[in-house]
Amino acid sequence: MSTFPGEDTRIPKRISEALSHQPLNHLVPKRELSRLLSKPVQISVQLESEDAFEEVPEELWQYPHPIDLDPLRLEESQPLRFRRPRGARLDYREDSSEIADLPGMGQLARACLSGTQLVDSAAIVESIESNAKKRKQTLAIGDVEMVSPDKKTKVMASVSPVSLNRVALGSQHLKTLERLMQYIGADESSAEFGDFEYWITLEDRATHILSEQCIDKLHIVFRNILSIPAVWTELDVSLLQRIMDVCVSTITICLEKIELKEYSHDYTLIAFGSSMVVFFIFLLDQNDRRLQLEQYMMVPLQFLTFTADNLEEEFDRGGNGVERSLAMLHSTLDVFYMYISNKPKLDDGLVVKLVYMFTELIMSTWSHNVSSVSLQNHIGNVKTIGMKSIEVLFEKLPEQRLFIIDELLSHLDNLPNTRSQKRMKNIGKNLHITHFSYIMLSILQVWNNYDYCSNLVSPDTEQLHDLIAHHAATQSDLEFAADHIIDTILKKCFSNISKYRFVFDQFVTDMTTVVTLPDWPVSDLILARLLKKLLSIFNPQSQKHINIESVALQGIGLIGSTILDIRLSSNSNPTANLIHLFNYPEDIDGLFKAYRTCLAYCTNSVQHHTPYKFLWCKQLDVLTKLKEMDKESQGWGSKLQQKFLSLIESIHLPLEQAANLGAVEILPTYCSTLLTSELINMYEPYLKLVLSLLERHKVKLRSGAIRCLALLISKDKNMLYTPIVKETIENRLTDSSPLVKDAILELIELGSSYIDFYQHININYNDDSMLVRKHVLRMNQIIYDDTEDIIIKAYVASRILRRIEDEEDVIIETARSELLKRWILSIQCPNAKPELQIKNCRVSIRVIAQLLVGGDKICDLFEHFLIFYVLNKNAHTEDQNKLISSSLCLLTDQVIEMVIENEAADVDNQREEEGRNIMKFLSVLSSCQDSFITKDHITALYPYLHSDTKSDFQLHILKVYRNTFEQLSHFKPKFLYDLETTILSRLPRMNVRELDEAIPLSWSLSRHRKDDTRICKACASCLGQLSPYIANATTDPSAVRPDGKLQRLLYLATGFARFCSFENTEGKFPNLKTRENIFEYVTKCLLMFTKENIHHVIRRIATKNLVKIASRYPKLFNSRHVLTVLDTQFEKGILDIQLVVLESLYDFFLAEERRSLIQVGVDGTISSNNELRKVVANHTKSDSINDGICSALVSRYLDKILKICLIADLNNAMVAIRFLKQILTYGYTNPSLCVPTVIALTASPNSYMRDLSSEMFSELLQGYESMAFNCLNQGIRLGTEYAVKIRPKQFHEDSMFLRRLQQLMSTNKRNRSKFLKVVKKTVFSNYLSTSVNYEESCYHIIYLLHNLSKISYDNMLELYEMLRSVISVSEYFSDRISERLDGFQSNQNTAAEVSAIIVTRLSIEEFKRFMFEQHHLSEAKLTLLDATDDENLRNKSVAALDDQVGSLHMENIFLGYENPINNKDYCWKYISTLHRDEI
């Protein structure tokens, strides 16, 4: 016997092999298993005895016949007991014949049978035939035999010859309802509570609720009845009332169970189903009062509100319960939405509850944390139906609109603080906004006149007038609501910016997102109102906190950028606004055509109803505004009346079928309609505000304004060329804030406008901020590469070149390497053809030549760059050095070719100037230690030495020859002879600069020829011709006249003495009686021409040449005779001679410095020229004999030099100032001796002189800060005297002297306080004290008070202390005047003294008036404050005055007199203004 079925067969193996290749879904119900994992286990059978689960007795296993129907111990075992089925009742009828025939049945069995219907005999079948779809199995194993199932029989639907009409069908539905009522019952007594299919009896056996099956059947019946309105009148109201009573009772009981957390039945599902039944009955539109009981509506709503309130708790518990609740809630609210949409009127209390419930659903925050896509969809569905319901309530109940808006606004805290898509409402492809903005836009669009207009047919004039009035009222309500929303949001945000800023940001972002979509036509009105509010924040009369202004500016920038998007996206003229339509009425039809296209688009929109109506009404708004522009014109009114009539007629006509346009295609058309909106018209005020904010002192505002401009420029690069924008950008590049400058530069980069702004960009090439300098450097490189203009290239290259003196090594290295790459390395770029190499080479030559025109400073920098970097072999690799060498050789060849081409051709002035510049470049190349000029080059240039053209061309050729002959050798003798002949023959016709090159060149030629005979003859001839003049100077100095020959002889003699090391022998100089050195002899000759009686022109030339010889032989500065000449000139000499001496000394010091730099830096790797000088100062000063002489000369004449710096003639003073800057840079003097003069020079009326002195003072501050503060008092006094002396009538026009010093010295808070103390001490101790002579200093006091009014203060305490001091001084002067009035009236006191005191007193009073006015103070306020208020005042900041704000009014001081000092009329006029008590 087999122990199991299939034993000894292959059936088990076949089954396992077959199943190994088949899905097991039909065997293992995975869906049900997954549900079981999370579903709590419930025991459906409650056992009172555990016998059924006792262990099997051992003897049972030993029973010889295991399969037996007679179990062991049958008599002793207890029977199994089963739990009563749900809904089963025990109130069976004993008289039932069917049950009576079944004796021995238990009570439960009888009850079950009594509630069971008899089965129809036709339903009894022998076997069950399944209609389930069979899977077609594939044969995997060859030896498995499978029987294919029979094909499924195709069942054809029979066509009934009888068709029921809808009324008959409705009657069938009513009968179905009546059959259901047999079980529900007309009342409690007739209800079939025992039928568990329709009723559920709770544990107390006295409470009954509808079953799920019953509710489902009610849903089906009522849905069918609702589809056939014709049978609604046949419904029995009492039947409906019974159903509603049962449903309300069911909902109430279920809600109680849910609150008690009882889960024996699905109470939630039953309550939702019952609520839907109630709402279905409401939809039947039965006006019977019996169905209008409050409980019928309030109980379901109470349940829905409870469910909505508990969604978050349910979500926190986890599981899929919340998803199920949301699905049921959505279905129920969907039915309720149908009800309120059709209901003409709702109770106010009901509306309030509905608004509360829907608002909580829409603005719930727990949904922000949902990650499940399915759950997000359910939440979105519920929020959508909630927003639709709110919109319906808003439309149907105008009196509740503000309440609805306020309720939504009360939930602003619930807005998402990020733009996460799962937290927002999807309104289109990749477009999302917050649910708050969605519902606000939706309800605001309800405010329209479409329905009003649709009721008009061919309106007359009166009706049109009423229409316009109605439209105005609607617009007024809409604008009021929009303002209320905006004010609430702004108030919320500004109350705590850090906490609620996201509310404002989200709202603005939402509005700018939808403003270009025709589905949301109200958004432009909201943005216009919002922008107007934000612009008002920057009203100067009501200044707000900087954080508020910053937030507002960010919003303004986003809105302004959106306006520009609209202007650029429009397919119409950007200026086609209302003014344009007023001037060109024929364009109105084109605008309305665009509107019709947008309306056609809206008809295809999902939410087309309200947007369509509002968009249509915007046409009406356009016509209304056009009418307001000229109310009185009858012709204009007549034209518009026709437009009004046409518009009203169009509402009754079908729209033209437009192409199926998408959001992208409709954008240009809709933007063209927006051009007439108020929002677009605010673009100009917006732009003006942004530009004005660039001039504010608050850096945060300026930075924000720049970001706004950046948004605009990124969209429209032509924005930078708008005159107002361009002018503002240019002005702001001089801004004091590095961040602002850098941001402005980024704006220019954004607009790709480098070349157009290249000059303004380079205003900041030497800015204090490394960030700005690096930015300018980077932009200059781009400009250089992008432009083809040689002048622009040279300009930016010069600025790059200046950065080799930067204090940052990174900038230095960048500047040097970039110039090397562009000027040198680019010549022979890899794989470049010879033609391209020549082209690159010539570009570099032209740029460098143009650059060298920039002055001595730029020439020195280029020479430094060339010698100390380009030709510094230690700074480059071996390959780079080879490339540099070959490139410079090619460069030199091309320079020579270009020089020859220019000279050979008939060129214009511009090309001629370019040729001179190129020749200057060649002279710089020739000065390099590694000369790239060959003998062939020298020979090629020789013919041009004979040119008689008076220009610098010959000078540069002489420089090239001089430098080259010092390095090259082995020239042909004939060439050397001819060249020497040419040079010597042209010496008498050369100017001073040419002589300085030609004479050393002649001496070099004589050494190459090893024959100095000819140059000695030339020198002897010169000295011989000079002898008669020396004789006259000895015997009769006054007889020496300044003729041209004598001047030229002096220069020639000096040149020979400086550059030629002659051997004074009788053979070479037979006419000289002395055999001393030629330079000594010439020095004595020059001393003869420096006598006092010699004409000052000759004296000036002789003194200049004397200093030049001494510069060549510095030991002459130790000569008593030379020093006597210099002492005399500085003590009592003429100014022009003093300036000549300074210029000569300047050249001497410069030459000494250059010599030191070359000694140290040729093979060095020092970063900058400044650093190189420091190395020179540290290592070679002690070794240089001449350095001591330089310092001694400066110390000897420093006082005279400083006085010359402060003379009234600014042009002459500039010579001394340049010399002062040089000696400070080279360290030839004690800086403390110069600081007061440097401070005084910052009061100069000349802007260049002010800038130069400010630069000098800044350098002194960096190295000697304490010393600078110690000298500040003296510097202010010296500067005051200088300012009054240099402009005695207009000294008061400069009120920024102290302000400039404050900006330079206030590098930190301590220094700012220190500066104020020094200034206060200077003013009150040195000028406003009892020991001052006011006749001499009253103008100084006016000047100081003018400047004192413009300095800034850190806090109110500093300002108050200053004003208190001024008030006390004012009282003192008032007493002084009173003391002297009697004496003046009796002629005992002079008018000079009295008038000076009056001027001082009035200037102090005017200062008080100005300060009180600018800082909104008064003397009364000052008197109320005491020492206890100091701490509060110290914590209050003081707004700095604008540079453009005026200062003291001189009319109030001078009383109309040009010179009040020593003027009796002035004194009497002042006395006449005094009160009797003051006299």
UniProtKB/Swiss-Prot annotation:
CDD domains in the record: SCC2
Keywords noted in UniProt: Cell cycle, Nucleus, Repeat
Keyword Cell cycle: yes
Gene Ontology CC entries for this record: 2-micrometer circle DNA; chromatin; cytosol; Scc2-Scc4 cohesin loading complex
Taxonomic placement: Eukaryota, Fungi, Dikarya, Ascomycota, Saccharomycotina
GO molecular function: chromatin binding; cohesin loader activity; kinetochore binding; sequence-specific DNA binding
InterPro entries, alphabetized: ARM-type_fold, Cohesin_HEAT, Nipped-B_C, Scc2/Nipped-B
Predominant location: nucleus
Family of the protein in this entry: Belongs to the SCC2/Nipped-B family.
PANTHER family assigned: NIPPED-B-LIKE PROTEIN, NIPPED-B-LIKE PROTEIN DELANGIN SCC2-RELATED
A GO biological process held by the record: chromatin looping
Protein's gene: SCC2
Location within or outside the cell: Nucleus
Record protein name field: Sister chromatid cohesion protein 2
Stated role: Plays a structural role in chromatin. Probably involved in sister chromatid cohesion, possibly by interacting with the cohesin complex.
The HEAT repeat ranges on this chain: 681-718, 720-757, 792-829, 1117-1154, 1229-1266
